[in-house]
Regions:
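Non-catalytic connector elements of ABC transporters
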Residues: 1-15, 19, 258-289
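ABC family nucleotide-binding domain
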Residues: 15, 19-223, 228
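Active-site/binding-pocket entry motifs
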Residues: 39, 251-253, 277, 281
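Short hydrophobic beta-strand elements within the C-terminal catalytic ATPase subdomain
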Residues: 93, 234-235
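A generic structural signal for secondary-structure junctions
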Residues: 129, 247-251, 276
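Conserved catalytic segment of ABC-fold P-loop ATPases
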Residues: 228-234
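Conserved beta-strand-loop-alpha-helix hinge in the C-terminal portion
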Residues: 235-270
Length: 289
């Protein structure tokens, strides 16, 4: 089942947004999952985690993924990152089959995992350096990205001197440093307080609007998904399947009071009903006698 109805609508409404890191070529980032199945665990009795996922994400679109705990949201993201190999089916970015991690896909986790012995600038510049970029150009890229996330004044700071929100901003800048076509985010704001989370959402949307990268964003927070996404994918209880694909037609840029719109709350209720039903199903599965 290929659930991408209406997918181009939100993306086309925004128009194309090529990458703008100077010499970098225009960014694509069209993502395709075709009948992707993933089984994990002991070889004798592998557990079915994802069941025949088919999905198209056009370049530059911001897609959020919601579902009950244990449904395979992170596995879906890790498969696109190249960290998990599908048992069946195919994952591709711009037609190229994904088999391993690559610089064309940047990843941001809930824990920023910065190198504590390196400065903020050195953390962000490391990716380009490892890719063979000259040190002065890598530093230029790092400074530009840190400016985009509002940390120009903290280039020479060490991670231990930054708040959780600041560290996550560094993590976003680092993930973008190699000019990826796709940005993968696994509950990146889950450990932050409500005010910092809201601020980080605005930072992310500003950077995304400027850079134009395709985003796949995993979250447990329905409000966050509706605030950020062009689309919201709802996953079933394990094994994970996509049971709804919701286009969010709210115009961008989205105001601070977007959550008070009737359309926002209509989508929120639709998501809530799905998550509640699937969470009950997951609970029942876990407590079967």
């Amino acid at each position: 089942m290929n659930l991408h109805h209406g997918a181009a609508t939100a993306s086309e409404a925004r128009g194309p947004m090529p990458g703008r890191l100077g010499a970098a070529p225009p960014r694509l980032g069209n993502v395709n999952f075709h009948e992707v199945t993933i089984r994990l665990g002991a070889r004798a009795q592998p557990r079915l985690i994802l069941d025949r996922i088919s999905l198209d994400i056009p370049s530059g679109q911001f897609v959020c993924v919601l579902g009950p705990s244990g449904c395979g949201k992170s596995t879906l993201l890790n498969a696109l990152a190249g960290f998990v190999t599908p048992s069946g089916g195919r994952i591709a970015v711009d037609g190229d089959t994904i088999t391993t991690p690559g610089a064309d896909r940047g990843v941001v986790f809930q824990d920023p995992t910065l190198f504590p012995w390196k400065t903020v600038l050195a953390n962000v510049s490391l990716g380009p350096l490892l890719a063979g970029v000259a040190s002065d150009e890598a530093e230029r890229i790092g400074r530009k990205l840190l400016g985009r996330v509002g940390l120009s004044s903290r280039c020479e700071s060490f991670p231990k001197h930054l708040s959780g929100g600041m560290q996550q901003r560094v993590g976003i800048a680092r993930a973008l440093a190699n000019n990826p076509r796709v940005l993968l985010m696994d509950e990146p704001f889950g450990a932050l307080d409500a005010q910092t989370r809201s601020m980080m959402q605005h930072v992310l949307l500003d950077v995304w609007a400027e850079v134009g990268v395709t985003v796949l964003f995993v979250t447990h927070d329905i409000d966050e998904a509706v605030t950020l996404g062009d689309r919201i994918l709802i996953m079933s209880a394990s094994p994970g399947r996509i049971i709804d694909d919701i286009v969010v037609p709210i115009a961008r840029p989205r105001a601070d009071d977007v959550m008070f719109l009737a359309e926002f709350n209509h989508i929120k209720r639709r998501c809530f009903d799905h998550i509640r039903r699937e969470s009950i199903s997951a609970f029942a599965q876990q407590h079967e006698v």
